[in-house]
């Protein structure tokens, strides 16, 4: 970053992150948020995949969804070219799961043109219970930061 680079203002970054987060609940990339040719570099546990385009991203969201879900933004950090967002997605229903993700999003003209996403995978009830016993957290997953 050079001395002439500026960080995206917090309000714009927060607004863009909230819109992006909504995709994980609606399972739709929406209009006016993601560029038609946006590049996605995704890192789920033990895998990596790349997608191009808002349509491909929307299809991927629908392919991995099973049951109603909610997504909550935990933190947004503006960058010179966009934002970093940490969020938690919770799936309700017969097999509830919780997943944490970290996204690095690049914006151009107000649209996401590139997104790199890291996911810890879906943690079901049994894994969360085992984790609580075997590796208690000093700072448990907070929903309010």
Predicted regions and their residues:
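C-terminal and inter-domain tail/linker signature
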Residues: 1-145
């Amino acid at each position: 970053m050079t001395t002439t680079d500026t960080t995206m203002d917090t309000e714009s970054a927060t607004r863009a992150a909230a819109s992006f987060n909504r995709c994980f609940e609606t399972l739709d990339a929406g209009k006016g948020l993601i560029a038609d040719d946006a590049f996605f570099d995704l890192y789920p546990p033990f895998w990596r995949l790349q997608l191009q385009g808002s349509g491909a991203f929307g299809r991927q969201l629908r392919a991995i969804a099973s049951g109603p879900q909610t997504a909550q933004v935990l933190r947004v950090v503006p960058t010179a070219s966009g934002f970093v967002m940490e969020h938690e997605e919770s799936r309700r229903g017969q097999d509830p799961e919780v997943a944490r993700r970290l996204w690095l999003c690049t914006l151009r003209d107000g649209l996401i043109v590139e997104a790199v996403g890291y996911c810890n995978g879906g943690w079901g009830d049994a894994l969360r219970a085992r984790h609580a016993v075997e590796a208690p957290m000093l700072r448990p997953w907070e929903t309010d930061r």
